[in-house]
Structure formats: C-alpha cells, structure tokens
From Swiss-Prot:
Biological process, per Gene Ontology: protein secretion by the type II secretion system
Natural source organism: Aeromonas hydrophila
Entry function: Involved in a type II secretion system (T2SS, formerly general secretion pathway, GSP) for the export of proteins.
Primary localization: membrane
Listed name of the protein: Type II secretion system protein N
Length: 252
C-alpha cells in the first residue's frame, strides 16, 4: 500500500512539474514583482520551459532577442539551470548556461561587445578624451560564486583589433588578453598585451576585502607616440630589458 502511495505521489509531483514548466511565459511575467519604472519586457512568447523576450529594458540599458531553455533534469537535482542566448551581431550579444545551487554558477558563457560600448559605460570620468576601437569577447568555461567574488573561475577576456586614440596620439594595442582565475577566493587576472607600440605584462588580484593590487611591466616599442615616450620616466627606472615597472593598488 505504501509503495502505491509513493508511486502515486511521484506521478503527481511529475505532473505538477509538467504543468508548471508549460505555463505561458506571458502569464508568468504578468505576476513577476518587477519595478515598472526600472524593468520593462516587450514581445514575451513561449513557455516557462522555452521562450523568448523580444526586448528587455533595464533602466537605460536593453537586451534584444533574449531566449531561454530550462533544463528539466536540473530541477530534479534542486539546482535549476537555464540556457540563455541574446543580442545580435551588431551590438551586445552572448550565450551560456547559468543556474543556482545555493549560489550562482555558470558555464560555457560567451559575451561579445564593441569596445566603444564598454567605454561609454565606464563609471568614472576620464582625465582626457579617449576613443577606442575593437571587439571584446569574454569566454567563461566555469564559474561559481563565492564570498564575495568566486569559488571557481576559468575564463579569458580578449580585445580583438584593439586601438586607442588619445590627445598624445594613436596607440595600436594588438590583441590584449586577460586570463581569469579564482585562487583562494581571490579574483586573479593575468594580462598579456603586445604590439609595435607597447608591450604590457602583469597580474591583477582582487582580494575578498575589496583591496586590489596590479603589478607588471611596460616596454615601449618603436611605434609608441613621442609624447607618450616623454612620460615614461615617471614610471621609474627601466630594467636591463627596457621594461618599466607598473604597480597600482587601492580599494574598490
């Protein structure tokens, strides 16, 4: 008798789960407690299991063609995860898998964005006019949220076709790369950049207490603008290979 009750209960739970994921996305969105002046959704279609939003507006930012696919098996593991895809090739776009198992996690994440789009959203005022060119691509193989930054992280940030135009001249940067890892809850980014104008190598560490430290070197190249070369002595004395020391620390 107990076995029959257990089987019936399992079937009931499975049926209720089926009904839940088949809920129309428009019905779910209608009952979400979204702040009306901050978040707006347009063109919602599909179901809770699989659907899309033509446009998601958050404050002054927006995402287009947001699509999702809920992993049903992940619900049985009590670690729901969803595959996301959004944007178009002309602007911000990306895809990946994100979820929650007591903390946020993600894998196979790719994010593409034009470099000028990022510069326009830098929160601090720059001391001089600056324009940039190129395309940024973030790839995250694995990520697990920690306290406060991360427990696990393997990824890379590339800046393809990187160029910067400053009052001191145009600065070709090649294709800079950041290798992203997490070590003992510290967010670590290793920078490797090289061009005919300048070569920069270094490591940035962000501590759990929000302290950061960047240490590296800068080696000028033949195409470095003369006005920029004049400022190199302020960095200190170069080593035997012509590399100037870089060190910045502070708190965010």
């Amino acid at each position: 008798m107990k076995q029959k009750v257990l089987i019936a209960a399992l079937f009931l739970v499975a049926y209720l789960g089926f009904l839940l994921v088949k809920l129309p996305a428009t019905l779910v969105v209608r009952h979400l407690p979204l702040p009306p002046n901050l978040v707006q959704l347009e063109g919602v279609s599909g179901t809770l299991w699989s659907g899309q939003v033509a446009r998601l507006q958050y404050a002054s930012e927006s995402l287009t063609q947001l699509r999702w696919e809920l992993n049903g098996w992940s619900l049985l593991r009590f670690a729901p995860e969803v595959s996301l895809r959004f944007g178009d090739r002309s602007g911000l776009n990306g895809q990946g898998v994100v979820g929650w198992n007591g903390a946020a996690f993600g894998r196979d994440i790719t994010l593409n964005v034009p470099a000028p789009w990022v510069l326009d959203r830098v929160p601090m005022r720059l001391p001089f006019p600056l324009t940039v060119a190129g395309q940024l691509q973030l790839k995250v193989d694995q990520f697990a949220q920690g306290n406060p930054w991360c427990d696990n992280l393997y990824g890379n940030l590339h800046w393809y076709g990187a160029d910067a135009d400053t009052p001191a001249g145009k600065l070709p940067l090649g294709d800079p790369e950041l290798k992203l890892t997490c070590i003992d809850s510290r967010l670590v980014a290793e920078l490797k950049q090289g061009s005919e104008a300048v070569q920069v190598l270094g490591k940035l560490e962000l501590q759990p207490n929000r302290q950061y430290l960047f240490q590296g070197t800068l080696k000028p190249g033949p195409e470095l603008p003369d006005q920029m070369k004049q400022g190199l002595p302020f960095l200190g004395q170069p080593d035997g290979q012509g590399r100037f020391p870089l060190r910045y620390q502070g708190r965010i």
